[in-house]
Every structure is written in C-alpha cells, then in structure tokens.
C-alpha cells in the first residue's frame, strides 16, 4: 500500500516523449477539490429591456457581441430591485454575482446584448452598464500539501530555453502507486510548517494564480470529484455502474480517470455481442461511461465524447466494428438526450456495427 497519495512533479516534453521528475511526495492534499472563489455581488443595470424583464429572478447568461466576437457573463442569483421607464422599454436595476464565462476578441463601438436562461434566449436589450469590460481571471483558493517530505524541493521548474512545453503538476496515486490523475499546479509556496502526521513531514501551502479559462473547462477537479477519486484509489473499478450516483462533475471526473487508466491492446476483438446497461444513461457523459463498460469493461476507455468515440472505432482500443451491440433500456437515453443518442447510433451503424435498441418491457 502506498503511504504517499500524491507526487509533486516537474515535467517537460521531448520530440518523442514526456519526461517526469518527482520532486516531492505528500500524504494528502487540502483545497484541491474546489470551485473558484465566489465573486462579490454587484449592481447590474440593464438598459432598454422588454417590460417582462422586470420579473427576472435566478441565474442567467449575458452575451455582449459584435458579429462573431462575444463575451459571455454569468449573472448568478440575479434579483431585480426595480425598473425605470425608458421610452417604450424599461431599465432594470438589479444585483447579481457577475463572472466571465467565455470571451472573444476585441469589440466594436456598438455591441448588442442578449439575455439567456438555460440556453434559451429571453430577449435583446440596449446595453448593460460597465459591460463589456476586462476580466482579470477566476481566483482560486490555495492548495495545501499535507505531510510532505523534502518541502525545500517544492519549487517551480526552472525555465530552460530549449524546453518549449514544460510545467509543474500534482499526480494522484492509487493504493498500488499507479498515477491515476494529473493536475496542473502552481508551486508558489506561501508557508511551510511541521506536519502533525509525523516527524520529518511538513505542510506546505501553495498560492494559486487566477485563471482566465472558465471553470467549466477546469484543470482543477470539482468538489464532487473527491468521492470519485476515493473510489478509484482502491484500483480500477471492477463493477459496472459505480459512476451512476455521481452528478455531472463527478461523471466527468470518472471519464477523465478512465482515460489515464486506458489499456494498451495489442490487437482488437472483432465480432461478438456486447450489451449496454442503459438504465443510468441520463446525459451524454453517462452514455459514454455505459458504452465504454459494455465494450471494454468497468473502468475502461472507449471515448469520452462522440469525436473520441469516432477515433476509437478506427481500432486500437480493444474492439473493432463488426460486432453486435444490444442497448438495454434505450428509452432512458431516448427520453433524456434524444438528439445525442441519435448521433451516436448513426455513427455506429455507419461503421458497420449491428445495433439493437431495446426498451424495458
């Protein structure tokens, strides 16, 4: 059993491979499974709105765009305080937590403004005070390495002129010492103190810089990923559907772990019959988790989304087209994600797979 569950590593790429140097090990980590630091609420004034905007409440997305260039802002927990007449329209005075979700390039002098809720366009209005504006990034809480040996080695990799791709990472290990996850990390040491876990061990607090990437394209694992990692620490799962209780972030984390644990196949199976357990396929992530387990077993990898599935169907991932796939309880996916299921079915049939969709009797 591996006592140290994390490794701090320097890495760089060569023409042929990736070189990894383990510089320190830690028994545990605190602050890794986190969302960005919440942003402060602020006043939001939407100018020239349809009158029905007076009744807005909840979470929204604001798009400020010129042609194909846009900024998307999340307006979280928006509360309307009142309205002011503006010709035939109204100005809406509200409060919300405002955070950039995505950004395009430079803007022209007269951007248009659209408001959305759950991808549904609610309407266009004339402007939002202070938007578009620069964004300085998502703030992240510090990460603490617990029980570190050799804390003096926890420092950023020195930049070398001949290295074009390099960096620092945190590797999570399972109980057998296999690297099961890799997370980019900044090694900006804020403090080092003796650890209560034993003599010669230290707790190291690492400040983390802001990131401009939206949280949905996170490098950091989501809070719900912790339970997924805990399960995988015992080794690659040997049972199907252990991912089913997890939310979307947890299922995403599960798919990420399958990719790093993917097997190397010397040859592919051709022909045969496989069954998808479709009872828990309620979103596109779970579709791929269930399909992967059907084709290459629990914890197996055969793509995390439809483009990766298309690549796997070319061969080299354990199973090649020419087989029969029986999809049990297909109505679950048919009700939840009909369009995505249809794309997957069409792709597999185009590749010569005999696919039979079965509904629960």
Which residues fall in each region the model found?
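Conserved helix-adjacent loop modules within structured domains
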Residues: 49, 54-57, 65-68, 74, ...
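Extended, compositionally biased accessory segments flanking or bridging domains
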Residues: 2-28, 32, 232-300
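Short acidic, S/G/P-rich loop/turn micro-motifs used as interaction or catalytic elements
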Residues: 280-283, 330-336
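Hydrophobic beta-strand segments of well-ordered beta-sheets in folded domains
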Residues: 272-274, 321-328, 353-356
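A short linear-motif detector with a strong N-terminal bias
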Residues: 252-255, 302-307, 334-336
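Hydrophobic, Leu/Ile/Phe/Ala-enriched alpha-helical segments that form helix-helix packing faces
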Residues: 170, 261-265, 291-295, 313-316, ...
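Helix-rich interaction surfaces within compact, conserved domain-sized segments
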Residues: 333-361
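Phosphate/adenylate-binding glycine loop and adjacent helical scaffold
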Residues: 1-233, 237-240
């Amino acid at each position: 059993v591996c006592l140290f569950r994390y490794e701090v590593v320097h890495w760089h790429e060569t023409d042929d491979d990736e070189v990894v140097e383990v510089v320190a090990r830690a028994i545990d980590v605190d602050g890794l499974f986190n969302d960005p630091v919440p942003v402060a609420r602020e006043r939001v004034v939407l100018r020239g709105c349809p009158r029905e905007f007076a009744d807005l409440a909840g979470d929204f997305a604001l798009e400020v765009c010129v042609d194909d260039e846009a900024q998307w802002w999340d307006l979280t927990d928006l509360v309307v305080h009142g309205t002011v007449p503006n010709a035939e329209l109204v100005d809406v005075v509200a409060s919300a937590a405002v955070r950039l979700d995505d950004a395009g390039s430079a803007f022209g002098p007269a951007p248009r403004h659209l408001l959305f809720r759950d991808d549904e366009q609610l309407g266009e209005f004339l402007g939002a005070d202070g938007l578009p504006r620069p964004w300085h990034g998502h703030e992240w809480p510090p990460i603490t390495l617990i029980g570190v040996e050799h804390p003096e080695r926890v420092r950023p990799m020195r930049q070398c002129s001949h290295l074009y791709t390099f960096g620092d990472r945190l590797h999570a290990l399972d109980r057998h010492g296999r690297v099961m996850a890799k997370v980019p990390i900044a090694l900006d040491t804020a403090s080092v103190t003796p650890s209560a876990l034993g003599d010669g061990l230290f707790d190291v607090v690492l400040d983390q810089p802001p990131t401009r990437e939206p949280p949905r394209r996170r490098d950091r694992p989501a809070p719900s990923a912790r339970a997924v990692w805990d399960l995988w620490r015992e080794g690659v799962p040997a049972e199907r559907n252990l991912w089913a209780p997890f939310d979307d972030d947890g299922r995403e984390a599960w798919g990420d772990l399958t990719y790093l644990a993917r097997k190397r196949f010397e040859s592919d199976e051709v022909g045969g019959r496989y069954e998808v357990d479709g009872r828990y396929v309620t979103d596109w992530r779970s579709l791929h988790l269930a399909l992967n387990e059907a084709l290459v077993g629990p914890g197996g990898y055969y793509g995390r989304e439809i483009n990766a599935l298309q690549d796997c169907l070319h061969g080299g991932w354990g199973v090649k087209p020419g087989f029969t796939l029986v999809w049990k309880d297909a109505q679950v996916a048919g009700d939840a994600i009909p369009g995505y299921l249809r794309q997957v079915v069409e792709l597999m049939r185009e590749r010569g797979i005999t696919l039979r969709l079965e509904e629960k009797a």
